[in-house]
Amino acid sequence: MRSASRLGTAQDVAIGAASAASAAFGVQTYQVRVVATSACRVRIGDGTPIALTTDSYLPADCPEYFTCTPGQRIAVIQESAGGKLSVTEVE
């Protein structure tokens, strides 16, 4: 069981055939919670990362937590269909 965390800033990123990146994470953000409406591939990185079809697989409707560094972003690309990636900063 996962311990409780404080939810911070949330944003949605469109999932499509081309990579799309989120806004930069806040200065106190070391973890993000993500959930997608359709299967996709994700990459977290500095600057503006570009998600590739060989990056980490995220199935639809399965919340996942990732460690990050303040100022990083998450990029997403569809597996087979478009959708929405919900990204929530966790404090």
Predicted regions and their residues:
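Short, surface-exposed beta-strand/strand-loop-strand elements in extracellular ectodomains
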Residues: 35-54
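Predominantly extracellular/luminal regions of secreted and cell-surface proteins
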Residues: 1-3, 31-33
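A structural detector for beta-sheet-dominated domains
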Residues: 14-16, 26, 35, 69, ...
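Noncatalytic modules at the cell exterior or secretory-pathway interfaces
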Residues: 29-32, 67-83
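Short beta-strand-to-coil "C-cap" segments at the C-terminal boundary of structured domains/repeats
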Residues: 46, 88-91
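Glycine-rich strand-loop-strand elements at beta-sheet edges
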Residues: 48-69
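General beta-strand recognition
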Residues: 41-43, 75, 86
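Surface-exposed ligand/attachment interfaces on beta-rich extracellular proteins
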Residues: 7-28
